Amino acid sequence: KNTKESIKDKKRELMMFAQSTDPLMFYLVSPISGKKIRNLQHIAHTEKTNEFFSNTIHFIKNNNYHNNPDVLVFIYGFICHFVLDSKVHPYIFYKTGEFIKDDSKTYKYNGLHHNMESYLDNHMLKKHNITKINLKKFCFSLKPFTKELNKVISYSFLKTYNINNMDKIYLNSLKQMNFFVTAFRLDPHKYKSHIYRFIDKFTPPKTFKLEAISYN
């Protein structure tokens, strides 16, 4: 079956899974014990990434899920994120430098990475003549995962990173990210940006700059 045809009605889900493990940053159900999950967001970008894809693809193949659209948008979304990061991040780091919390020499780069990503987002929107976009409707579909998709997510993260119940954790993280985008990030009139900028004046140089999260 043609893959493009099989997932044509899953565009929102594809966009959602193209965020890969980034939603794990918003796993605040348990602020302290959840730190392991929040750290996984970065670990999954830098450690055992090929192993994760290999484990996932083999599990899909061995269980005959290769024609399951819900499973396909998950793996294709994660691959899209991996390819984009691999291609774009070197350029972003080249332009903005790298902020390292324990290195005071890099404090001048604080927030620039996020600002550059927002700039590239806006550039792509302008290029495609898109004047308005609703992030929630564009890339969030928070329906419960199918049984097959739950199995794929659970197996892949357990096999690769030895973490249980990732199907539930990942969906929970998406829900919290969805709330965060609405409450703190969407800023069409730039009111939040002014508030964040004011707060940033009183925070230490190594603290993440809130202004970077404002998105209009």
Q: What label would you give each PLM region?
A:
Residues 1-77, 82-216:
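N-terminal leader/auxiliary helical segments
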